[in-house]
């Protein structure tokens, strides 16, 4: 997936799901299922409930996302 095709949005982690999946509430109120990007997995970035994150979505399926950044 090319960078130009992605939609980046801010959100908050609502709950942790199995297999490193998370339920994220976006700023616009929508709730999506998100997984951690490979670089965050490789560097052992921990994500907890309530964390502010940046997610990347494809325009083809707006119910799934990839977490690409965790705000401090």
UniProtKB/Swiss-Prot annotation:
Question: A Pfam family in this protein?
Answer: eIF-1a
> What is an example of a GO molecular function annotated in this UniProt entry?
ribosome binding
Q: Which GO terms describe its cellular component?
A: cytosol
Identify the PROSITE patterns for this entry.
Answer: S1_IF1_TYPE (PS50832)
Q: What does the subunit section of this Swiss-Prot or TrEMBL entry state? A: Component of the 30S ribosomal translation pre-initiation complex which assembles on the 30S ribosome in the order IF-2 and IF-3, IF-1 and N-formylmethionyl-tRNA(fMet); mRNA recruitment can occur at any time during PIC assembly.
Function, as annotated: One of the essential components for the initiation of protein synthesis. Stabilizes the binding of IF-2 and IF-3 on the 30S subunit to which N-formylmethionyl-tRNA(fMet) subsequently binds. Helps modulate mRNA selection, yielding the 30S pre-initiation complex (PIC). Upon addition of the 50S ribosomal subunit IF-1, IF-2 and IF-3 are released leaving the mature 70S translation initiation complex.
Stored HAMAP family: IF_1 (MF_00075)
What protein name does the entry list?
Translation initiation factor IF-1
The source organism is: Haemophilus ducreyi (strain 35000HP / ATCC 700724)
Which gene codes for it? infA
């Amino acid at each position: 997936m090319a960078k130009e095709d992605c939609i980046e949005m801010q959100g908050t982690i609502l709950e942790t799901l199995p297999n490193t999946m998370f339920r994220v509430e976006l700023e616009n109120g929508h709730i999506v299922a998100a997984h951690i990007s490979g670089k965050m997995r490789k560097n052992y970035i921990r994500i907890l409930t309530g964390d502010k994150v940046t997610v990347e979505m494809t325009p083809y399926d707006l119910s799934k996302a990839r977490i690409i950044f965790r705000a401090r």
